[in-house]
Amino acid sequence: MTLLNVCGLSHHYAHGGFSGKHQHQAVLNNVSLTLKSGETVALLGRSGCGKSTLARLLVGLESPSQGNISWRGESLAKLNRAQRKAFRRDIQMVFQDSISAVNPRKTVREILREPMRHLLSLKKSEQLARASEMLKAVDLDDSVLDKRPPQLSGGQLQLVCLARALAVEPKLLILDEAVSNLDLVLQAGVIRLLKKLQQQFGTACLFITHDLRLVERFCQRVMVMDNGQIAETQAVGDKLTFSSDAGRVLQNAVLPAFPVRRRTSEKV
């Protein structure tokens, strides 16, 4: 089943110039893509290529300058109030900058309950039980419930944001560089959790990343983005080989797991 369909999406930002006239900076140009239920897709690209802007459009934080985004066959621009509430539950996003994505004055308990209060019909006791359950799912315990964001490490706060997104049982989870910055142990745990959710609920995942190793370990399909456009799309096999210049640049930038010793035929 197709969850998300993007057709001919373009976007620009207007800013004032020295002449006082508004100038338009193009960020996305004619982007089209689809995401299906249970699918894991990577959006791969260098910083500044338009990945995060596309993500903000997909979750409805901004409206595109041109083109259409459809969720389960319905255009986002035409959703009524009830449909928009359902959409906000169905699609959740975890941002790279976790400290900016939460209220620093709120406790972890309040942060986790927030989407449940607005998007689900659960009693307070049920919300608290699910908050505890979600923390356990991301390898955190109840000891963090009364802490505030400044009291947590960056990795812990990122996991709290992931738990918050998962608390409403979304059909699509968008992770904007949200896993790449975790250490390898935490990253492996998150990947195991997401695979479990896919098997149980058919949750789809869109990884926005520049981490090619993450793509190879977890994703079924990869789209390479460059200068606001999709440069290529391909299935992820045993070994990725890109045809686009942008893809090859990212592939060549990956360091080997261990340093390669150079062999010399002569002793110095």
Curated annotation (Swiss-Prot):
Bilayer-spanning residue ranges: none
SMART domains: AAA
Domain ABC transporter, chain residue ranges per copy: 4-252
Entries under Gene3D superfamilies matching the protein: P-loop containing nucleotide triphosphate hydrolases
EC numbers for this chain: 7.2.2.11
GO CC term (a single one): plasma membrane
Pfam families registered for this protein in UniProt: ABC_tran
GO molecular-function terms, A-Z: ABC-type nickel transporter activity; ATP binding; ATP hydrolysis activity; nickel cation binding
Keywords on record: ATP-binding, Cell inner membrane, Cell membrane, Ion transport, Membrane, Nickel, Nickel transport, Nucleotide-binding, Translocase, Transport
Annotated residues for binding of ATP: G45, R46, S47, G48, C49, G50, K51, S52
Record family assignment: Belongs to the ABC transporter superfamily. Nickel importer (TC 3.A.1.5.3) family.
Job description of the protein: Part of the ABC transporter complex NikABCDE involved in nickel import. Responsible for energy coupling to the transport system.
Subunit structure, interactors included: The complex is composed of two ATP-binding proteins (NikD and NikE), two transmembrane proteins (NikB and NikC) and a solute-binding protein (NikA).
Name of the protein in question: Nickel import ATP-binding protein NikE
Annotated source species: Shigella flexneri serotype 5b (strain 8401)
Gene encoding the protein: nikE
